[in-house]
């Protein structure tokens, strides 16, 4: 092991550490970070070399953060990334600094938004917040209005998690939806992601995603937002139901098929008497 450590350069050590951090299960970033810190045994190298991994993890996981002085949480996503560690809260029209290691927001300041699309963004956000409140008790959503390739675009992000470390499991739901404001109809594109980790007496992970495409009728802001939510609700319900049904099918068929109903001898074993069987055999061989 010592020889292997001597062969690894600092760059290689940081690269390996960064991979561990980026792939940390939801709710277990601190545990993975602390383990990697012990393995690397060089805090300065870890903080400087793996800083990009801390940021990538929060962006990928849609990490929610509370900003002091504001009621609602905002998601840390690539769509709100303003560079240099600053992020946008489109609802409150502020930008703030975010510490990717401590997961803390500081220095909130007023920030400009795309006024041309703000009425559309607000309508979608209002409808989406009502949907999230109904379907995700711990859910957080953030809606962005941006110009992408000259087109006015709405991007809606949802995050909901359950962290149950005492019960040895953690899980997170993420979904991202996009559509452009175009006359008559537009295309809605979404991606749904589920990640769950169960680690009592084992290590089992569920990592699943599904891509969605649908058409949306564009009229006024409020009606378009309502139609958009119908698409979101139908797709997310269908996805969650399908996963539940697949797990039930696996439990009823696949896992049962892996178990042998009877041992090779075709005779059931009385486990309460197994010890006496062993003692008797040893006595016969004596």
UniProtKB/Swiss-Prot annotation:
GO terms for molecular function: actin filament binding. The modification N-acetylalanine is found at residue 2. It holds the Pfam family F-actin_cap_A. One of its GO terms (cellular component) is F-actin capping protein complex. SUPFAM superfamilies: Subunits of heterodimeric actin filament capping protein Capz. The keyword Acetylation applies. Keywords: Acetylation, Actin capping, Actin-binding, Phosphoprotein. InterPro entries: CapZ_alpha (IPR002189), CapZ_alpha/beta (IPR037282), CapZ_alpha/beta_2 (IPR042276), CapZ_alpha_1 (IPR042489), F-actin_cap_asu_CS (IPR017865). One of its GO terms (biological process) is actin cytoskeleton organization. The modification Phosphoserine is found at residue 9. Belongs to the F-actin-capping protein alpha subunit family. F-actin-capping proteins bind in a Ca(2+)-independent manner to the fast growing ends of actin filaments (barbed end) thereby blocking the exchange of subunits at these ends. Unlike other capping proteins (such as gelsolin and severin), these proteins do not sever actin filaments. Component of the F-actin capping complex, composed of a heterodimer of an alpha and a beta subunit. Component of the WASH complex, composed of F-actin-capping protein subunit alpha (CAPZA1, CAPZA2 or CAPZA3), F-actin-capping protein subunit beta (CAPZB), WASHC1, WASHC2, WASHC3, WASHC4 and WASHC5. Interacts with RCSD1/CAPZIP. This is F-actin-capping protein subunit alpha-2. It comes from Aotus nancymaae (Ma's night monkey). The gene is CAPZA2.
């Amino acid at each position: 092991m010592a020889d292997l450590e001597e062969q690894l350069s600092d760059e290689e050590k940081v690269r390996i550490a960064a991979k561990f951090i980026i792939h940390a299960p939801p709710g277990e970033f601190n545990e993975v970070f602390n383990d990697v810190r012990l393995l690397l045994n060089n805090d300065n190298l870890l903080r400087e070399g793996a800083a990009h991994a801390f940021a990538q993890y929060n962006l990928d996981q849609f990490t929610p953060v509370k900003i002091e002085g504001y009621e609602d949480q905002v998601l840390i996503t690539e769509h709100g990334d303003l560079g240099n560690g600053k992020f946008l809260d489109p609802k409150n029209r502020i930008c703030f600094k975010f510490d990717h290691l401590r997961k803390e927001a500081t220095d909130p300041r007023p920030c400009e938004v795309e006024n041309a699309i703000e009425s559309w963004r607000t309508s979608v956000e209002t409808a989406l917040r009502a949907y999230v409140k109904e379907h995700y008790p711990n859910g957080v959503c953030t809606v962005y209005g941006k110009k992408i390739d000259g087109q006015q675009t709405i991007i809606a992000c949802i995050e909901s998690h359950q962290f149950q470390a005492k019960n040895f499991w953690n899980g997170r739901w993420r979904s991202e939806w996009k559509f452009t404001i175009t006359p008559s109809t537009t295309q809605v594109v979404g991606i749904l992601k589920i990640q769950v980790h169960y680690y009592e007496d084992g290590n089992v992970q569920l990592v699943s995603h599904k891509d969605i495409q649908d058409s949306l009728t564009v009229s006024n802001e409020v009606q378009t937002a309502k139609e958009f939510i119908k698409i979101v609700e139908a797709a997310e319900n269908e996805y969650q139901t399908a996963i539940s049904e697949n797990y039930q099918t696996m439990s009823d068929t696949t896992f049962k098929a892996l178990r042998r109903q009877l041992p090779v001898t075709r005779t059931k074993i009385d486990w309460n008497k197994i010890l006496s069987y062993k003692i008797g055999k040893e006595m016969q061989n004596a």
